[in-house]
Amino acid sequence: MAKMIAFDEEARRGLERGMNQLADAVRVTLGPKGRNVVLEKKWGVPTITNDGVSIAKEIELEDPYEKIGAELVKEVAKKTNDVAGDGTTTATILAQALVREGLRNVAAGANPLGLKKGIEVAVERVSEELSKQAKEVETKEQIASTASISAGDSAIGGLIAEALDKVGKEGVVTVEESNTFGLELELTEGMRFDKGYISPYFVTDADRQEAVLDDPYILIVNSKIAAVKDLLPLLEKVMQTSKPLVIISEDVEGEALATLVVNKIRGTFKSVAVKAPGFGDRRKAILGDIAILTGGQVISEDVGLKLESTSLDLLGRARKIVVTKDETTVVEGSGDPDQIAGRVSQIRNEIDKSDSDYDREKLQERLAKLAGGVAVIKVGAATEVELKEKKHRIEDAVSNAKAAVEEGIVAGGGVALLQASITAFEKLDLSGDEATGARIVALALAAPLRQIASNAGFEGGVVVEKVRDLPVGHGLNAATGEYVDLIATGIIDPVKVTRSALQNAASIAGLFLTVEVVVADRPSAGAAEGGDGAGAMAGMGF
């Protein structure tokens, strides 16, 4: 495919035009009085959102140079979302401000590499200052405040705070769509996985269609069980203890399943058989987790353990197991706390090393089931459009609240960045273009506050100058128009979100300024004339 090449100022201005189009679409959503953006979908209903990364992902520009500029800024939003789960709009606005000021200086003759170095030094110093300003999250109310600001709804913030309070730091909070109106919080007691009983004959509570076994033995097998002769020696040992038996294996079928069902129906022996969750290596890992949690061993020929020679000391124990047709919950497993802690540490290391979002998510779920708990927020609304918008807001707010618990909080409303820059730049010892790069950062750090004020109907420049003179932590409450102690009023941001937004914006801005040549694909004539394929159809008699 033929290429187009742009040099020098033309190259940078083409990229800037693309960046501005994307950033201007995103910036209107910032703050308590920010507006929403409607995104057209090829299939299904349009989406209404105020989430920066969702808007950025949907923007595709026609001009090749502008398209590349927009893609570079998309990367800022995506990276911030991956690291912190929120702050994507702030990151985009910071990137735009850094690039705009930077290009102005490059056009005036500044050395781009000197500017880039100055930007990097200044951002590192501001990040350190933000970390110093950060306060630990000490109360449930503070979690509720940060989640409420992200979601724009105090009821959602309160529910998220309750969920995180129940499941702890390592817990997982998921958001699901519900068929009913409003919000509902569902908490899981113990470890739950999404596989139920193999046969409905195992049910002990006919009304609830559940099999509930108290103080059972738990047999964990990494293979299918079909022959009753393999299972019989163990069944006899368990029956002598008068305890029920839970079997978690790849499958139980044939005469082995028939024997268990017949004994259950006759009342001779209470048991339930459950298929192991997951597939392949993930199934092995989850079975290992269950074994550690219950103090048992995975019976597998890989480690030289055979079903027919299994003894009671290789079985796991738990206070209670509840099995429905779709899921199994293990309550209070009898595993060794030190072994569980070791397994948790191992999973944490795997999360740190993993470069796949999907793998990280699955590992985080395993970690939560072992170390924390699982809370599900069920959200319902009158229409599908409202449901999707609400669900999206809640997911962002959950990420925001988790980030606050992780690294602490700073004053919200764009104030922390502005005030951190005042103290950070007092100690900077730079000269020439590097000093200019630091000044670019100082100017850019006022951009989020200016935009929040502007979206709320105030004069941005006036608000910025007023906040500069206020004590640290004091600033504009854009919802009411008052200048208050932001942390005391509950207007707070997680420092992780604020820091990630700045670092990612600076990373892309520095690269933007050093660009001298842009090479892009030349648009084909066919794409320009009829991208929807109508032209091709016309020649076929349609």
UniProtKB/Swiss-Prot annotation:
Keywords: ATP-binding, Chaperone, Cytoplasm, Isomerase, Nucleotide-binding. SUPFAM superfamilies: GroEL apical domain-like, GroEL equatorial domain-like, GroEL-intermediate domain like. InterPro entries: Chaperonin_Cpn60_CS (IPR018370), Cpn60/GroEL (IPR001844), Cpn60/GroEL/TCP-1 (IPR002423), GroEL-like_apical_dom_sf (IPR027409), GROEL-like_equatorial_sf (IPR027413), TCP-1-like_intermed_sf (IPR027410). It is found in: Cytoplasm. It is an enzyme of class 5 (isomerase). Gene3D superfamilies: GroEL, GroEL-like equatorial domain, TCP-1-like chaperonin intermediate domain. Pfam families: Cpn60_TCP1 (PF00118). ATP binds at T29, L30, G31, P32, D86, G87, T88, T89, T90, G413, N477, A478, A479, D493. Its main location: cytoplasm. Its EC number is 5.6.1.7. NCBIfam families: GroEL (TIGR02348), PRK00013.1 (NF000592), PRK12849.1 (NF009487), PRK12850.1 (NF009488), PRK12851.1 (NF009489). Forms a cylinder of 14 subunits composed of two heptameric rings stacked back-to-back. Interacts with the co-chaperonin GroES. HAMAP family: CH60. Belongs to the chaperonin (HSP60) family. This is Chaperonin GroEL 2.
